[in-house]
Amino acid sequence: MLRIGQDMSVHRGEWRVHASAVDDIRVIEDSLAWLCGDGVSISTQKEKSTLGAPMYTISSSMTGKQSMFSLTRLERVSIEEILLSGLESRIDEHKFLHLRIDLAALSMGKGELSLNKDTMVAKGRFKLEVYPGQSAYEVARSIFEGLV
C-alpha cells in the first residue's frame, strides 16, 4: 500500500458528484477518472430529484492505494489550505475525512479545494487508517504534510 507521511494511510475512499440533466456528464466522468487514476471504475446513476427533475450521481470507490493516489492530485495551495483551515473540522466521528473539490477546476485537470458553498463540487470521503493510540487528526495531518 502506498504510504505518505510517517506510515499513514487510508483504508478506502470515494468521490461523488451530483449533477443535473443539463450538465455535461461525460466531462464529469472524465474528470473523476483523472482524479482517481487508472483502474478505478466510475459509475453513473440516473435518478429523480425530490422535485421530479432528472439528475445524475457520478461516483467512484477506491482502495486505500487508489485513494492515496487521488489525494496526490490535489493542488499544493489546496493542501496548504486544508492544513491551515481546520483539518479537524473535516474529520467526522467515524474517522472519515471529507473534502470538497471545485468541479469547474477539476474539469480542467486541477484538484482545487472549494470553499464556496454555491459552486458545484466533487465530494470526497476517505476512511482514515487509525489504530489504537493514534488520533484521526494526527493521521490526516501526517498524510497532508507528506503531500506538500
For each feature predicted by the language model, list its residue ranges:
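Short glycine-/aliphatic-rich beta-strand segments at the starts of folded cytosolic domains
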Residues: 13-18, 93-100, 124-128
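Beta-strand elements of well-folded, non-transmembrane domains
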Residues: 17-21, 36, 62-66, 103-107, ...
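Acidic, Ser/Thr- and Gly-enriched intrinsically disordered low-complexity segments
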Residues: 35, 55, 65-80
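Glycine-rich, aromatic-bearing surface loops/beta-hairpins
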Residues: 101-148
